[in-house]
Amino acid sequence: MYEEWLDKYEYLIELGKSLNDYPESAKTDDRLIKGCQSRVWLDYRVEDGRVVFNADSDAIITKGIISLLIGLYSGRTPKEILSSDFSVVEKIGLKENLSPTRANGLVSMIAKIREIASMNV
């Protein structure tokens, strides 16, 4: 079990490294996700009716988590995002293997993605 979760953490770290560059000038308070212990900035734009996310974090595991969420939901329409099964995170066992503060941050990240989608329906 330990090795399996070590592999998943290593995968999250690699995902975090794969995020697009996030400009320092975009790291503003209005882009911070509230409820995360680490600082997580989330930005978006709408292109051809699809929401495209970009993000960064000052913590490597958290950066991997937001990268995973971006991979799942970026490029979808707001309606697709809102009708998505967000329990996928629970199905892969991510939430229960995070510290309570990281798990709360994960919930906050998902809530922010859903909020952005609902603002753009």
Task: Name these PLM-found stretches.
Residues 53-61, 70:
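Glycine-rich active-site/cofactor-binding loop and its immediate structural neighborhood
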Residues 1-39, 44-50, 76, 89-121:
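N-terminal intrinsically disordered, cationic/polar leader segments
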Residues 65-76:
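Alpha-helical support elements that line or immediately flank enzyme active sites
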Residues 30-36, 56-57, 79-84:
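Solvent-exposed interaction patches of small proteins and small membrane subunits
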